[in-house]
Structure formats: C-alpha cells, structure tokens
A protein has these predicted regions:
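His/Asp/Glu-rich metal-coordinating catalytic cores
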Residues: 4-26, 32-36, 41, 47-177, ...
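Accessory terminal helices/loops
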Residues: 171-173, 178, 189-213
Length: 213
C-alpha cells in the first residue's frame, strides 16, 4: 500500500492528490484510490486484496480487474469498468487507466486537472509477462510511485533465469511430486504460463488458483 507524507508540493498549482486516513484522495473529484476503508467512490488499481476494500458504494476499475473482483468478492459489487487509455470525467477532473504490468487488469491512474498531470503507478512491473499487458511509460508532472521493493538491496533475477532454475529442479525431481508455492492471483498465472511453455505435463493447482485462472 501507499505510505507517504504529502503536505504541499512545490511548483504544484494544487494539491490534487492528498494522503488521508482512508488512503489516497482526490478532493476535487471526491474520489479515493485503493482506499483502506469503505468510501463513496473508489478507483481500484488491481484485484489484489491489499488494494481493495469491500463496502464502497461505487468502484471504478479496468474491465479485467472488474472480472477478477467479482470472482474474488462476489457479484454484488457496484462496478463501473473502463477500457485502458479511455478518458473519463469525475466532477470535471479527467482520469484514465493505463497498464502497469503487475497482473491481469492492473492499472496506473493518470489524472489531468488544468495544466497539471498526476500519475499514480500502483504496483508495477517492467519485465515482460505473458499474462498481462506490459507497463506503459507515461509523461507526468507529479508521480506517486508504489515502491514496496524499491530499496537497492532488492535485485531480482531475470525471468528466464528463474524459469530455468525451476525447470532444472522439477526435471531432476521427475520421480517425485514437485510442489511450488505462490500467490493465487498474479504469481500463479505467470508461473503456469512459463511452465506450460516448458511442456510440463500433469500440472495441478489449488482451488484458489483455479478460481482465478
């Protein structure tokens, strides 16, 4: 989740996005982004549970995120789904959703007000991933960037190196059952995609993963 202190931005004509007790808030549009608690109107960047709060009156998200939210949290959600790159107005403030490359349906939120452009990245990934649209590089005046693993100590191996390591391990253990643990939405689909490309047979998944596939 987002953790930052934003009192006033130098050179900004307005504090378009502020941090409140419920999360990131666009007061001009009376709209929250990935709120921590139930609110009137919420834009949801993706379907991971740490970015979604049940009980909001209205949700706005990408089409794919809407599909996943209904599968995870039920069909009674009041969802408005928006295509990527399509602008929409809320109280005169211009919003649009753009791929963040994190998981299926994940979005950056671009906000335009007057001459200023703000961008909220949410979780993002710049590596290629067959299971979702690639991260879209956008121009912005002010950037609010999710940085869960932003410290230099986090240095991930390339995808092909990880896949090669897993493939080698599973192949060497072909007389046994190999069990891989991963998050049910995002990591699981990415791993399945890579394993399928290696022509592994008889891959079974937990019911929580099957629900998301």
């Amino acid at each position: 989740m987002y953790e930052f202190r934003l009192n006033r931005l130098i050179n900004s004509q307005q504090n378009l996005i502020t941090q409140r007790i419920n999360g990131l808030y666009c007061e001009s549009a009376n709209t929250w982004i990935d709120p921590y608690k139930p609110v009137e109107k919420a834009i949801i960047t993706h379907a991971h549970s740490d970015h979604f709060t049940n009980g909001c009156r209205e949700y706005i998200c990408s089409i794919e995120t809407g599909f996943l939210l209904r599968k995870r949290f039920g069909n009674n959600l009041n969802l408005k789904t928006i295509d990527y790159d399509k602008e929409f107005l809320i109280n005169g403030i211009n919003f649009s959703l753009h791929p963040s490359g994190h998981i299926l349906g994940s979005s950056q939120i671009k906000i335009k007000a007057g001459s200023e452009i703000w961008l909220i990245t949410s979780d993002l990934k710049r590596q290629k991933d067959k299971t979702c649209k690639s991260y879209e590089k956008l121009k912005t005046d002010f950037l609010i960037c999710e940085s869960t693993f932003g410290l230099p100590i986090f240095n991930w191996e390339a995808t092909n190196e990880v896949v090669d390591s897993i493939t080698k391990w599973v192949t060497q253990s072909e007389d046994s059952i190999s069990i891989l643990f991963c998050y049910s939405l995002g990591k699981a689909q990415r791993l399945l995609s890579e394993l399928n490309s290696q022509n592994f047979k008889n891959i079974y998944v937990h019911k929580s993963i099957e629900k998301m596939n």
